[in-house]
């Protein structure tokens, strides 16, 4: 029997360079390279398994997920307007019901870099069991408040960090 636990499942419409899944097997000495080859053989186009190995850190050590959000360069006006706000309340939908989260507590300012006709935002958001925030809260707020279409954002998860901001491996 195989038992699988997905840490921080990715939301629909988002991309990731770092997915992690813990697999528990009864095999005493699994051949990780064989697992990697077998998994890659059945993955959809564009999805590549880059590493299979013994657990180094338990999934509950994940505290933050870091993202790169790419918008058209014209989004700068909405981001500047967000930065000028004192408060940015959003409704977070969860298993225990909905609650209001103050985005400014977690993203006080949105820093961005413009490259040609795009701009990039690099940010880390809480991804712990106690509090898990999705970047779609920000993109949804920007759409609702400033008319910046959330669908114009490309959201790419880059890495996970522990509570002390070390790379989760």
Regions found by a protein language model. Give the residues of each.
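Core RNA-modification/binding signature centered on pseudouridine synthases
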Residues: 87-169
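Short amphipathic alpha-helices in soluble, non-transmembrane regions
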Residues: 33-43, 78-87, 137-142
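A contiguous pocket-lining binding segment that forms or flanks enzyme active sites
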Residues: 66-101
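Short glycine-/aliphatic-rich beta-strand segments at the starts of folded cytosolic domains
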Residues: 19-23, 63-71
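Extended basic-aromatic, gly/pro-enriched interface segments that bind polyanionic ligands
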Residues: 41, 48-50
């Amino acid at each position: 029997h195989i038992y699988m636990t997905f840490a921080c499942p990715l939301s629909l419409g988002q991309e990731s360079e770092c997915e992690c899944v813990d697999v528990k097997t009864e095999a005493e000495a699994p051949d990780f390279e064989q697992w990697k080859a077998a998994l890659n053989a059945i993955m959809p186009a564009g999805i590549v398994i880059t590493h299979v190995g013994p657990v180094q850190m338990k999934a509950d050590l994940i505290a933050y997920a870091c993202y790169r959000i790419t918008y058209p360069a014209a989004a700068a006006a909405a981001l500047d307007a967000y930065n000028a706000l004192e408060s940015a309340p959003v409704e977070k939908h969860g298993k225990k019901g909905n609650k209001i989260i103050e985005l400014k507590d977690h993203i006080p300012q949105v820093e961005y870099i413009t490259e040609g006709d795009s701009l990039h935002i690099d940010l880390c958001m809480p991804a712990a069991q106690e509090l898990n925030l999705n970047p779609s809260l920000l993109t949804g707020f920007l759409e609702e408040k400033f008319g910046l279409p959330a669908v114009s954002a490309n959201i790419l998860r880059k890495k996970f960090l522990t509570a002390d901001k070390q790379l989760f491996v």
